[in-house]
Amino acid sequence: MSVTKEIKTDIINQFGGSEKNTGQTEVQIALFSRRISDLTGHLKLHPKDKHSRHGLLKLVGKRKSLVAYLKKTDIGRYRKVLADLDLRK
């Protein structure tokens, strides 16, 4: 299941401040996290879906690099995002 437009705007407003602020690192991490959780649920129902698993691993890698970038640039925002999204270090 893909992320609907309403869910996407809610995430953007929550993490970006306004719906025009889509490029902020926190917003991108939150959107990736939502897509990752949706794909994880899909893979629990369909464990042999290798193409979706590959896409999931690509999303996890992209989110990991964004989290590393945020840690390098602004440690305060990094800690806030980890707390808000319940991500591990």
Curated annotation (Swiss-Prot):
SUPFAM superfamilies reported for this sequence: S15/NS1 RNA-binding domain
This protein's record includes keyword Protein biosynthesis: no
Keywords carried by this UniProt record: Ribonucleoprotein, Ribosomal protein, RNA-binding, rRNA-binding
A Pfam family matched in the record: Ribosomal_S15
One GO BP: translation
Function according to Swiss-Prot or TrEMBL: One of the primary rRNA binding proteins, it binds directly to 16S rRNA where it helps nucleate assembly of the platform of the 30S subunit by binding and bridging several RNA helices of the 16S rRNA. Forms an intersubunit bridge (bridge B4) with the 23S rRNA of the 50S subunit in the ribosome.
Name of the protein described by the UniProt record: Small ribosomal subunit protein uS15
Gene: rpsO
